[in-house]
Amino acid sequence: MASLEGTKAPDFELEGSDGTKHAIRNYSGKTVVIYFYPKDNTPGCTKEACSFRELHQDLQKMGVVLLGVSKDSLKSHDKFIRDFGLPFVLLSDPEAKMMQDYGAFGEKVMYGKKAMGTIRSTVVVGPDGTVVKHWQTVKKAAEHPEAVVDFLRNR
């Protein structure tokens, strides 16, 4: 999939770990970071989530909303949040509809085999609803949140 940079962010409506429905249209006027990850409570995803946790106050000071998205259930998200003290909302996309719209679900190679799955990626949506940054394939999960914050600081 081509980069989404410069395009209107695809809308979505998903249930969040906070018990409410979330849609990109509800964040008009705010900068939103949406990061897509494969699975709660797995090594790479936990490192990425904990790195975002450590930087969450920096994001809040900049007025940035952070949302994590995976196919996991809300029950799984609740456990993940509790286990690691995550201070941000996780969205459940069990059918991968939003992930497909954002290029975060498709064919990937794991351990030499092709399979369909979540592609670790991140988008930054500006206050006008336009995607201003799109990391299409995140390779270093633990370091990636710092790159996101650096991008936002230097914008």
Language-model features, listed with the residues they occupy:
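Chalcogenol-based redox active-site neighborhoods
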Residues: 1-155
